[in-house]
Amino acid sequence: LAPRHPQRGEAVAALAVSRGLGVARRSQGQVPGPGCDVHVADTTGEMASWYAMAGVTVIGGTFGTLGGHTPFEPAAQGSAIVHGPDVANFAEAFAALDRAGGAVAVPDARALAGALA
């Protein structure tokens, strides 16, 4: 899980822990292992590597009213994309990726869970 702003890593990790999940934080040098449910990638300059390792990327900011974040970076690294309905900031790019099969739009969290299962 990569927060848009790495300084939010501690808060993101705390939220995951509060939900009973095991967490490792990249910024703290923690390595995911047994019992780690969430790896918080709260560093800068490594997103291309994370996308290259990810078979699927869920684009944040598309499940609320933020307009979504760029799909170009994960697409360039060959990571399939799942996104929510609010893609206003990159509407043409998401539409092209959806048509080409490089991205899948889902309407809500329940459908997201189904798409990732």
Task: Go through each PLM region and give its residues.
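Nucleotide-activated sugar donor-binding and catalytic core shared by glycosyltransferases
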Residues: 1-117
